[in-house]
Each structure stands twice: as C-alpha cells, then as structure tokens.
C-alpha cells in the first residue's frame, strides 16, 4: 500500500510490529524501521522479530508506558530503555552500549536530529 501511494518505504517505522512472519520479512526487506519495547520482547515472536531486525533499522519505543496504570516518570522510561537495550543485545550477541549507540544514530537519521 505504501509503495502504491508513493511513500518512501525506507522512512516507515513499524511501532511494536505484531504482523505475520511474511509481513515482517517484506517490511524488513523493504528497509523499514522497527521500534521495540519491553512488552514486545515478552513474547517469543516479538523476541524473534527483534533478533532479525537489522541494526541500522532498529529503534526503541519511547512512548511509555506500554501498559496502563504503570509508572510514567522519566526515570522509569530510562530504566525501561536500558532493559530493552540489554535484552536486544543478548538476542543479537553484542554489547548493550552498541545497541544504544546504533539506536541513537538511527534516531538522528530518521528524525533528522542535529
């Protein structure tokens, strides 16, 4: 649909992707970005998708909280992002600091942050 409408697919961000495996592969192969949060990593399918997201297409979700009636302070968001980075790092067999630096670079690229 996005290609049909003329949108640049490489600027699409899938927020907490929960589609089928085939849809995931199509979106990944098209160069879409994927944002990940702790709740996504709580499921087997979510962890598998996170493992397969290319590092240059990975973002972390910052629209906390993922659950209603949970703490929404800046500190709780920072802790959640750190846990998410560590979990993704373990899935990808790399250091959490690498995940954090890649995500920061991706955010700068996607959102044209200077």
Regions found by a protein language model. Name each.
Residues 1-30, 40-53, 67-79, 93-97, ...:
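Divalent metal-binding pocket/active-site signature
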Residues 2-3, 56, 105, 114:
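Compositionally biased amphipathic helical and low-complexity segments enriched in hydrophobic
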Residues 12-15, 34-36, 58-62:
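Hydrophobic faces of well-ordered beta-strands that scaffold small-molecule active sites
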Residues 34, 66, 109:
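Active-site micro-motifs of SAM-dependent methyltransferase domains
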Residues 34-37, 72, 87:
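Conserved short-loop catalytic and cofactor-binding motifs
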Residues 78-114:
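Mid-to-C-terminal alpha-helical segments outside catalytic/metal-binding sites
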